[in-house]
A protein has these predicted regions:
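N-terminal leader/auxiliary helical segments
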Residues: 1-89, 93, 97-258
Length: 258
């Protein structure tokens, strides 16, 4: 999964590729769309230091293909229409489009652990933040957009049985807290705290300078990012048809979330 900022940035840009009526809907339910752009990742934060049934839902939903997830979600929305739910789903589509396009390169590059999977994603976030003039990149709060009302949590939980609104609220809340913590100025203390969560958590701590271990992979990743953005409009159109009348999704949805 490209990290916090890459997904949020992608969703902001992808919204411009939607038809006007969907752009208006996304703007009305911006919180749901923004949270949707992080996909099922919030489950990983439900109880990050311990293995739990709810936390494992993150792995379960990442193993699903796009067809399995989006056709099932579309069926639920046809049975119980929800404009907020629709906005959330187009946000999740952003997450899926970016992950499914970038993950093959990330997995291949990190297969030998140099750089690590999360390390590369974090460095890609640092690159995009710097490119967008959000400097210093390591002091930006990537979790500031992660907010949901209780009603929003109820809406989101409907896409992830057997999750509940409480599951969603806790996962999103701790994810936002982690994002806020990652922007703290005391980097030594931050590194010490996140090392408690293991290698994956430690690699979430952004370097203050470019990470040379990732240098050769940033440009290819950015090209894949642009490719995913180009694909989004056609994928969104397919999702729209699926929502309207159950039209099956195409081969672009055959791969898993990763």
């Amino acid at each position: 999964m490209p990290s916090f900022y890459a997904h949020a940035r992608f969703a902001r840009q992808a919204a411009e590729y939607l038809p006007e009526h969907l752009r208006l809907s996304v703007n009305r339910f911006r919180q749901l769309y923004d949270v949707g752009s992080q996909g099922p990742d919030f489950f990983f934060y439900y109880q990050p230091l311990f293995k739990t049934k709810m936390g494992q839902l993150g792995h379960r939903y990442h193993r699903m293909t796009g067809k399995e997830f989006f056709e099932g979600a579309a069926e639920r929305l046809r049975q119980a229409p929800s404009e907020g739910g629709q906005a959330y789903l187009y946000g999740v589509l952003c997450h899926y489009a970016l992950d499914s396009t970038c993950h093959p390169l990330i997995r291949s590059a990190s297969a030998e652990g140099c750089p690590g999977h999360t390390e590369l994603e974090t460095e890609f976030d640092r690159h995009l933040l710097t490119k967008d003039g959000k400097v210093p990149a390591h002091l930006q709060n990537p979790g500031r957009l992660l907010r949901l009302t209780w009603g929003g949590c109820l809406t989101v939980s409907g896409f992830y049985p057997p999750a509940t609104a409480y599951t969603v609220r806790r996962g999103i809340g701790i994810m936002a807290l982690a994002g806020r913590a990652l922007s703290m100025k005391n980097r030594k203390l931050l590194q010490a705290i996140f090392r408690l969560g293991g290698e994956h958590a430690a690699q979430m701590v952004m370097y203050t300078r470019p990470n040379h271990r990732c240098a050769q992979l940033i440009e290819p990743l950015e090209q894949l990012y642009d490719t995913a953005l180009e694909r989004y409009a056609s994928m969104a159109a397919q999702l729209g048809s699926c929502l309207a009348d159950g039209t099956p999704l195409g081969p672009e949805f055959d791969v898993t979330f990763g």
